[in-house]
Amino acid sequence: MTYDTLIVGSHIITPTGIIDKNMILDEGKIVKLTNETPSCDHRINAEGLVSIPGVIDPHVHYGVYSPIEQAAQSESHAAAIGGVTTMMRMLRLGDSYEKSLSDQLTYSSNSHYVDYAIHASIFTLDQVNEMQFCVENGVTSFKLYMNLGGEVGHVYMDMKPGENVLREECVEVNSEIITKVVQKAASLGCPVLVHAEDYEQCGCGIKKSKEKNLDGLSAWSKSRPSESESHSIKTISKLARDFNCVLYFAHIGSRTALQQINEERKNGTKIFT
């Protein structure tokens, strides 16, 4: 049998240690680690080099400032250069998934240099009702932006394929939406990714900073207190326990938040971070 590619001579890092083997690749996958040198179309001499597993980046935003057919090429190319072999996109749609998901999937499939997956962001009750549709079309994780609502509800959605127009929306990810997303995700056996900030606290903090004419990173940080983060973590963790849902807290930004996560784990919440 002739394989696509054979990489010879490298030190291969595995979960159990470093081994010296040849690596056989076929149809884009590693199919065997061996001492043999089978027939191949391409042979790469990696003598003295180290082969490490590709990095999985589970949290990437692209398709917002350029349409996905352009963004996927540029961002996945950069990912590949940096050793990221799987990237997971936070898809944000301002309209129906039943209406727009198919085009996003089609244009994505023709544009990536590396493996990829998609998290579906849920902003409305109508989109909650489309979570089953997302799963049926291969999207099996969901994102909640607890930071978006009220005076801080503005967000840029992903562009439509073939268009190059920014799509600004105003959303309100309220307690009803959060509860229904967690409940539905649990019933589907899907995890929920969480941006954990309380938008009411953040909105109040930003308003106070503006009233005092404060600006810069320090003002930004003070307007989004760690208590906002820990409060959101506590709120959604209780829901996750009630419905037996798995949570993944993205980009935790404070010691207070991490302490709250540890406390929620002790309470039985299934959490990744």
Where are these regions (language model features)?
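Metal-associated gating/positioning segment near the N- to mid-region
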Residues: 46-111
